[in-house]
UniProtKB/Swiss-Prot annotation:
Top EC class, one word: transferase
Self-association state and partner proteins as the record states: Dimer of large and small chains.
SUPFAM superfamilies: ACT-like
Any one GO molecular-function label of the UniProt entry: acetolactate synthase regulator activity
Name of the protein described by the UniProt record: Acetolactate synthase small subunit
TM stretches of this protein: none
């Protein structure tokens, strides 16, 4: 069993998202991350869901999703075929002496300090789940994390 990511294209209609989430809930599948937004065709939305299961479970979820009237296409996101990213905002309590180190680490992760006061910094990062988790672990050792807000995974096909 491992983390799996599904990309679902569906009609951008009232209740469509609710039916997809309801299917997961009714079947006892956990949603670890979900993002939803219209595509370039505003009548179609893309849902990206991260869940946990083996290949057989994911195939079953896909078959059940295809039965929903609004669902147009379901694709499992494979690592080698897609770019995957997530956005994170993190608020930390740091001293003046820690600020320079926070700035250097944030730059190394290609992040931005979007707000800073004498003892609070808010940082924006984008990257893979692993990349963001690594940044969090480094900040836990260096500062006091006040709050974290993560967007959930988004993806796009490489070719």
């Amino acid at each position: 069993m491992k983390h799996r990511i599904l990309s679902i294209l569906l009609e951008n209609e009232s209740g469509a998202l609710s039916r997809v989430v309801g299917l997961f809930s009714q079947r006892g599948y956990n949603i670890e991350s979900i993002t939803v937004a219209p595509t370039e065709d505003l009548s179609i939305s893309k849902i990206t869901i991260q869940t946990f299961g083996d290949k057989k479970v994911i195939e079953q979820i896909g078959k059940q999703l295809h039965k929903l009237i609004d669902v147009l296409k379901v694709t499992e996101i494979e690592d080698e075929e897609h770019f995957k990213r997530e956005i994170m905002l993190i608020k930390i309590n740091n001293t003046y002496d820690q600020y320079r180190k926070v700035q250097d680490i944030t730059n190394a992760f290609r992040g931005y300090i979007i707000s800073a006061t004498s003892n609070i910094s808010i940082i924006q990062l984008s990257g893979t789940n692993k990349n963001l988790d690594t940044y969090i672990e480094i900040m836990k050792k260096l500062t006091n994390i006040i709050e974290i807000s993560r967007s959930g995974i988004i993806s796009i096909y490489k070719n």
